Amino acid sequence: MEPKNSYTKEDLILCGEGKMFGEGNCRLPSDNMLMMDRITSITADGGIHGKGEIVAELDIDPSLWFFDCHFKGDPVMPGCLGLDAMWQLVGFYLGWSGGPGLGRALGVGEVKFTGQILPTAKKVTYRLVMKRVIKRKLFMGVADGTVEVDGRVIYEAKDLKVGLFQDTSAF
């Protein structure tokens, strides 16, 4: 599939099935762990560092699986799922930019939570700015990101790191 500047849910599902970047290359999670419904924009030279930018969205539906179990009587989307979504997007960016291998989260420098995602929300927006993209034996991306709910920033992450690995058996 040729790289595009935006992707639908159907495209993202194909990525999860390994049909976007080729067999053995970057995949998004499938089913319930895919934390976005669309990528509205992805660029190779956007963002304040000129290294790339990604914007994606998740439509909130009160019937989403995590609201039933986190927490009973006090439903809130787990913050770790928003963090994972940002890692998913850094990995997607690396595959989109031609990187070979399977993505693995390598860490994050700092995370701040200043709000929550409730079942009454309408939309979550993820915004990532690539700070560094290493294209050597190891493909690795470093990005800063935010999670917004209905236009308000509620999570901030600095130095999200994802690498692509040809062999994950020793990881």
UniProtKB/Swiss-Prot annotation:
Record-level GO cellular component terms: cytoplasm
Signal peptide start and end residues: none
Subcellular location: Cytoplasm
Record: active site: 70
Pathway assigned in UniProt: Lipid metabolism; fatty acid biosynthesis
Domain of life assignment: Bacteria
UniProt-listed Enzyme Commission number(s): 4.2.1.59, 5.3.3.14
Family matches, as InterPro entries: FabA, FabA_FabZ, HotDog_dom_sf
GO MF terms, alphabetically ordered: (3R)-hydroxyacyl-[acyl-carrier-protein] dehydratase activity; trans-2-decenoyl-acyl-carrier-protein isomerase activity
CDD domains: FabA
Keywords: Cytoplasm, Fatty acid biosynthesis, Fatty acid metabolism, Isomerase, Lipid biosynthesis, Lipid metabolism, Lyase
Reactions this protein catalyses: a (3R)-hydroxyacyl-[ACP] = a (2E)-enoyl-[ACP] + H2O; (3R)-hydroxydecanoyl-[ACP] = (2E)-decenoyl-[ACP] + H2O; (2E)-decenoyl-[ACP] = (3Z)-decenoyl-[ACP]
One biological process term in Gene Ontology: unsaturated fatty acid biosynthetic process
Pfam family for this entry, one: FabA
Keyword Transcription regulation part of the UniProt annotation: no
Subunit structure: Homodimer.
Protein's job: Necessary for the introduction of cis unsaturation into fatty acids. Catalyzes the dehydration of (3R)-3-hydroxydecanoyl-ACP to E-(2)-decenoyl-ACP and then its isomerization to Z-(3)-decenoyl-ACP. Can catalyze the dehydratase reaction for beta-hydroxyacyl-ACPs with saturated chain lengths up to 16:0, being most active on intermediate chain length.
Family recorded in the similarity comment: Belongs to the thioester dehydratase family. FabA subfamily.
HAMAP family per record: FabA
NCBIfam families: fabA, PRK05174.1
UniProt cross-references to PANTHER family, sorted A to Z: 3-HYDROXYACYL-[ACYL-CARRIER-PROTEIN] DEHYDRATASE, 3-HYDROXYDECANOYL-[ACYL-CARRIER-PROTEIN] DEHYDRATASE
Protein name, UniProt field: 3-hydroxydecanoyl-[acyl-carrier-protein] dehydratase
Native species: Pseudoalteromonas translucida (strain TAC 125)
Name of encoding gene: fabA
